[in-house]
Design a protein with these regions (language model features):
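A ligand-binding cleft/hinge motif common to bilobed small-molecule-binding domains
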Residues: 121-132, 244-262
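Extracytoplasmic substrate-binding proteins
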Residues: 38-40, 46-47, 113-114, 124-202, ...
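Short secondary-structure boundary segments
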Residues: 61, 119-120, 196, 226-229, ...
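Bacterial N-terminal signal peptides that target proteins for export
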Residues: 4-21
Length: 309
């Protein structure tokens, strides 16, 4: 037998460090393979084998977390992203990174029997890596109000909460129709500039849920066009002469207040002359959950206050 050299010790030490990880991954594979499963087609067009009764669900986006809790199935959640802050109960759950920078090792360590992802946000390569460990990933892709409602129904079906999901869907659709009826008789479509960020100035174009919310609420989206999230200079916005400016900050609330004060310097703007600059909760507009209808109603009340007194 040859004597051990330093490289042997290094290799042995490396293997010792890897053993717990390998064992953990093997256990995870065993967990996700037990129980009955069925095939489901997700909103990315993929056929996914999902468990009949998932008990260890990991949410890969704040909107998914909200939907699961809205369905009354929060106990199934074993991991969420660091941005999952609603409802408050979600904040105490184990974190698996941000929805853009997912921590694969943490996800696997939670031994989920189902992960639910969003197509617009979760990196596809990480989703593929999760699936490589035998963990099913069901992807949703809500891009308008209809598909937001469909997403709630599909998640409800995944979690055996279809009755609650149908109730939420019916309520959402009824509230959408009430808004449409109220704004239909106004005969006006005020020019709306919806500002998502302060540096740079970003708005929401035609192919976004926010555009649909503005139009459904009876407004004209000044950022409509081919780009989903176009950038604007201050001069470009001034030239558009918005009648309503709505600001939602992706960062600090102070940014929104500062931006509002900056707009008010331009007294020639119709929105400034008529005191129609508003700051809104970003989560009501960029998360396709039941709360997005709160955003629609808020928007309609801002654009057509005479119809929502």
């Amino acid at each position: 037998m040859r004597p051990l050299n330093m490289s042997d010790y290094a290799n042995f030490a490396t293997r010792r460090k890897l053993y717990p990880i390998v064992i953990m991954l093997m256990l995870a594979l065993v967990v996700v393979k037990t129980g009955e499963s069925r095939l489901a087609r997700d909103q990315a067009g993929r056929t996914v084998s999902v468990p009949d009764n998932p008990l260890r669900v990991v949410s890969l986006a704040p909107s998914i977390t909200e939907i699961v809790f809205a369905l009354g199935e929060g106990d199934r959640l074993k991991g969420v992203t660091q941005h999952c802050d609603f409802p408050p109960e979600a904040q105490s759950l184990p974190k698996i990174g941000s929805y853009v920078h997912l921590d694969l090792e943490r996800i696997v360590a939670l031994k989920p029997d189902l992960c639910i992802a969003v197509r617009d946000g979760n990196p596809r390569n990480v989703v593929t890596e999760i699936e490589a460990f035998g963990i099913p990933v069901y992807t949703v892709d809500p891009r308008n109000l209809d598909t937001a409602v469909d997403t709630i129904l599909e998640v409800g079906q995944l979690l055996n909460a279809i009755t609650k999901a149908q109730h939420l869907a019916n309520e959402m659709r009824a509230r959408i129709e009430r808004v449409k009826v109220r704004v239909a008789g106004t005969g006006r479509h005020p020019r709306v500039f919806f500002q998502l960020g302060t540096a740079p100035i970003v708005s929401a174009g035609t192919n976004t849920v926010i555009h649909e919310l503005i139009v459904t609420a009876g407004g004209q989206n000044l950022a409509e066009g081919t780009a989903s999230y176009p950038l604007f200079s201050m001069e470009q916005v001034l030239a558009l002469q918005p009648e309503v400016i709505i600001i939602t900050s992706m960062t600090k609330e102070l940014d929104s207040e500062q931006m509002s004060a900056e707009w008010r310097q331009y007294e020639g703007l119709p929105a400034v002359r008529n005191n129609r600059i508003f700051i809104v909760d970003a989560d009501l507009f960029d998360r396709p959950t039941p709360r997005i209808i709160n955003g629609l109603e808020t928007l309609a009340g801002i654009i057509h206050p005479e119809s929502f007194r």
